[in-house]
Amino acid sequence: YTTSKSLSSFAEVYEFAREGASITFGVPIAEFDRVFIGAGYERTRITTTKGVPPTFYNFGERFGRSSVAIPLTLGWSNDSRNNPLSPTAGEFKRLSLGLSPAGDARYVTLSTQYQRFIPLWSNKFTLMVNGELGWGEGLGSRPYPVFKNFYAGGLGSVRAFEGGSLGPTDNFGTRSGGNLRLNLNSEFY
């Protein structure tokens, strides 16, 4: 069970309450490669107050304030980092396909990530470059569910910015996210 609050800096105007279960299995297929497969059940309730972003309001009006999704996932990763917690050399690659073919919320997602860790000056420093792409689309006549929107900003995305603070906003400054995210960043340590 999870709850997500609005990413608006002006007011809390919506909340997502998600309950469900999922299971994912990862199977190594080579020294650095792993394949993942998973399935789950999610029920998401949207609680709203005044000032709701139009996309959220319209989604709730069209499909109700409660949606059920049956997410299926398939993924692959390649991890040649020399240390998974504090790497100084190597690469990490990930590709993931998500599909919810049944339930109220029907959608497909695709996400990918590439990281490279480059040792510098006799391994005293490391340069990390990172690229991430996330995309989602509704299936059939259904729009992409607003509770699956992508956000940027914060730890793991763009540091020095508040979590979810980058991206589209409505006239009230409410962060609504979107169905596409591109993140390119680097770190030197």
Label for each model-derived stretch:
Residues Y1-F92, G156-N179:
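Gram-negative/organellar outer-membrane beta-barrel architecture
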Residues A17-T24, A69-L72, A89-Y189:
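C-terminal transmembrane beta-barrel domains of outer membrane proteins
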